[in-house]
């Protein structure tokens, strides 16, 4: 299977859409894999790899304001996904798989089939949702202002009802209004399947009073593996040690 970085995808306004691509031998179809708000293409590589193992070319891409995309967060998010879908048509039919905001964009796209994972179907999140988007979700986003995402969500057109195979996925412990919105939307679609994920769900429970003061440190710890600075520092160090430094075996057996 071939794996490569893609640099030739161009959005409607001329910006490059950075992407990684898996290409199985003899593939006749492809899937654009799109992250949610605050994510990046690297976070979607696991899903893309599993899709590629099923014989489909899989392209994980960065939306503007995220990852290596050169443009700041703005209203052209769907342009980035559409440019990726158009580019992938060289392989044949094209699907779109997206999470959260990426799932909403996938449902708005021209893809032949769509898998939307916990899609953000509401344009007006709850107070709790707004707080998470502004205070937590946008840490890695290059945005004109912390609340730009709220303006973008409000400006999105209604999610279209399209007659195509559509998979809608939510977690059993997902956000309740999101689950209701997903199931209501599924009822309006001609060819929709709904899947509920039950494994590896966080369970509700009481928290100690000091948890909010600890939360930012925990989130920084969890997010480090997907930090763009880590993507530069760790690979560079490893390559320097293994490919450029003098070779030498380390005796791990001990005396």
Question: Which stretches of residues belong to each language-model region?
Answer:
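Alpha/beta-hydrolase active-site loop
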Residues: 43, 72-89
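Alpha/beta-hydrolase fold nucleophile elbow
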Residues: 90-100
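The alpha/beta-hydrolase serine catalytic core
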Residues: 95, 104, 108-254
């Amino acid at each position: 299977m071939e794996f490569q970085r893609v640099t030739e995808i161009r959005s409607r306004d001329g910006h490059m859409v950075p992407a990684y691509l898996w290409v199985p031998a003899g593939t006749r179809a492809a899937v654009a894999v799109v992250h949610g708000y605050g994510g990046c293409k690297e976070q979607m590589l696991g899903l893309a790899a599993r899709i590629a193992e099923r014989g489909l070319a899989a392209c994980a891409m960065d939306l503007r304001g995220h990852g290596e995309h050169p443009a700041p967060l703005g209203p052209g998010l769907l342009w980035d996904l559409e440019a990726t879908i158009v580019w992938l048509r060289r392989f044949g039919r094209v699907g779109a798989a997206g999470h959260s905001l990426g799932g909403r964009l996938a449902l708005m796209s021209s893809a032949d089939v769509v898998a939307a994972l916990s899609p953000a179907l509401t344009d007006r999140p709850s107070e709790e949702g707004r707080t998470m988007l502004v205070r937590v979700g946008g840490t890695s986003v290059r945005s004109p202002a912390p609340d730009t995402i709220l303006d973008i969500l409000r400006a999105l057109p209604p999610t279209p009802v399209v007659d195509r195979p559509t998979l809608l996925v939510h977690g059993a412990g997902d956000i309740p209004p999101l689950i209701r919105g997903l199931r209501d939307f599924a009822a309006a679609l001609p060819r929709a399947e709904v899947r509920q994920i039950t494994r590896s769900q966080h369970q509700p429970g009481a928290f100690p009073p000091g948890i909010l003061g600890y939360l930012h440190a925990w989130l920084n710890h969890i997010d480090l593996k997907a930090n763009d600075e880590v993507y530069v520092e760790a690979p560079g160090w490893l390559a320097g040690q293994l490919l450029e430094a003098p070779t030498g075996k380390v005796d791990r057996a001990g005396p």
